[in-house]
Amino acid sequence: SVSRGLGDVYKRQFPKMGEKAYFVAIPTSSGTGSECTPFAVITDEKTGVKYPLADYQLLPNMAIIDTDNMMTQPKGLTSASGVDALTHCLEAYASIMATDYTDGLALKAARNIFEYLPRAYAEGQTDVEAREKMANASAMAGIAFANAFLGVCHSMAHKLGAFHHLPHGIANALLITHVMRFNAVPNPTKMGTFSQYDHPHTLERYVEVAEFCGVTGKNNEEKFEKFIAKIEQLKETVGIKKTIKDYGVDEKDFLDRLDAMTEQAFDDQCTGANPRYPLMSEIKQMYLNAYYGVDETV
């Protein structure tokens, strides 16, 4: 489990920052939002397991968002990090910890990503406005999920990336619509108990994002399906492939390691804020659907 695997890490304390020097973060890509979060991810080199860490000593004292540092991002990094930022918006908005404060940031960041990521991908070396809007979206999404946390898509992406050496943003891109379908079912088993959170309204939450990003439809179900299609179209526009298999992950190796990957994803710290409680069998099926490109609700 994570608790056993991270025993040595949990015994250590992060040094108190800011007494001798400020922790200043200057991002050079638009995706992780790390310049605005108290999170880090480390990999155990012996086991290959990725672990997310959370501590306010990891939160920078200052973030400098300067588009000049982002103009030379290659297309692959632009697309992967951009969809990573979109995943931050979607998971923060659906999170059981979401609030009015995080919702506004997630909504505006998501709309910027849909509008400006294709431009940043196509003409990123010269389109300063697109780079600026993506830089802002990344930081805004970072602030949103720093306070609302994420969900099981990131849990699964952490382990998929570690087991099969896929970039983190690509892993999120391959999984996000499968997780959205999983979360948006009627009457899902809720993850946590909070006074402001009686039961999940995840379909309605996704539809709110969809409407803010220009999606219309006769009812929530139609709007949700159109939103899924809009996300898939964005991914295609920025050169992201459709399935895990398309990225050259060997089928036998994937299946052989699937159970271990599933167990570690369930134990990941991001799982706890997901709006629907996932069984390990359901995580496993979402991995399989993402590998083979099966668009079915788990």
Identify what each model region corresponds to.
Residues T37-A148:
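Carboxylate- and glycine-rich phosphate/diphosphate-binding segment that chelates Mg2+/Mn2+
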Residues M97-L105, Y121-K133, A148-C153, M191, ...:
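Flexible, glycine/charged-enriched surface loops at secondary-structure junctions
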Residues I170-D253, E296:
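Gly/Pro-rich interdomain helix-loop hinge
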